[in-house]
Amino acid sequence: MKFGIVINTSRERAITLARELMAWLTEHGQDYVFDTESALRLQTARTAPIEELNKQCDAFVSLGGDGTLLFTSHYSVTKPVIGINVGYLGFLTEFSPDEMVPAIEKVLSGNYSIHNRSQLEATFRTDGKIEQLRALNDVVIEKGTYPRIPTFVIKLDGELLGSYRADGIIIATSTGSTAYSMSAGGPIIAPKSSVFVITPICPHMLTVRPIVINDEKIIEVSIDAPDGEFPLNGDGHLRKLLAPQETVTVKKSQQVINLVANENRDYCEILRTKLLWGREHDSTQ
């Protein structure tokens, strides 16, 4: 089996783990390749452009935090992804560093299960050409440096949902509900729920609240403003600066992300641990 390995090159712990993984895979007769940036940091000749890894590899290993896993997921397509948490929260990265080798062994033996995670697909135009982006967590349209409050017009299946005067709009999957959407006041949604959540960012309207919709709905968002440029982001990466009245169409992608599951993890325990639920505030700090 051949593994594509993507690491957060800014984390020394991830570098150390990558070297340990290289040694283990070599010892056990398994092949591997790194994306170009990771290979340069590790000074290894086993490298390929990250766009080519999916064609060359049977599975992916992400060494970093949730951001590294999101980055990896954009290129893994249908291949299984083993997420090793070397970050902070680790909602998506299923395994700790100590669980790295056992996770690899499970994949090699074929004795593993998969979490299928839905993605968003956003369609827009650039220079007259239709472009698409896929996002595991969220698609965000925001006001950027625009000095006033724009109006975001949202339609569901062609019917007007509402016009939101706000700093931006977040459209999140159930997976992404614990990311930017949660920080903006959106609900936590259980993974694999067949819904999306639309969360306004700092709405200038007291009655506006996030709304949860069926993930079969087609969402259209346009910006009503006299001028300005408005960033369109997918999973935290800028994809385009939108013009006023330009429309972005968001729907469920046909492609899912296959995350190798850690059967020792419990989602309720993750919420309690990561979000510090039920813990007393330490008054000494």
From Swiss-Prot:
Catalytic activity: NAD(+) + ATP = ADP + NADP(+) + H(+)
Residues annotated as catalytic: D66 (proton acceptor)
Annotated GO CC locations: cytoplasm
UniProt enzyme class: transferase
Biological process annotations from GO: NAD metabolic process; NADP biosynthetic process
Gene3D superfamilies for this protein: Probable inorganic polyphosphate/atp-NAD kinase, domain 1, Probable inorganic polyphosphate/atp-NAD kinase, domain 2
Superkingdom to which the source organism belongs: Bacteria
Gene Ontology molecular function: ATP binding; metal ion binding; NAD binding; NAD+ kinase activity
Annotated residues for binding of NAD(+): D66, G67, N137, D138, R148, R165, D167, T178, A179, Y180, S181, M182, S183
Record keywords: ATP-binding, Cytoplasm, Kinase, NAD, NADP, Nucleotide-binding, Transferase
Subcellular location: Cytoplasm
InterPro entries cross-referenced by the UniProt entry: ATP-NAD_kinase_N, ATP-NAD_kinase_PpnK-typ_C, NAD/diacylglycerol_kinase_sf, NADK
Main subcellular location of this protein, as a coarse class: cytoplasm
Any Pfam family hit: NAD_kinase_C
Cofactor annotation: a divalent metal cation
Record EC number: 2.7.1.23
Function as written in the Swiss-Prot or TrEMBL entry: Involved in the regulation of the intracellular balance of NAD and NADP, and is a key enzyme in the biosynthesis of NADP. Catalyzes specifically the phosphorylation on 2'-hydroxyl of the adenosine moiety of NAD to yield NADP.
Family assignment from sequence similarity: Belongs to the NAD kinase family.
Name used for this protein in its record: NAD kinase
Lineage: Bacteria, Pseudomonadati, Chlorobiota, Chlorobiia, Chlorobiales
Primary gene name: nadK
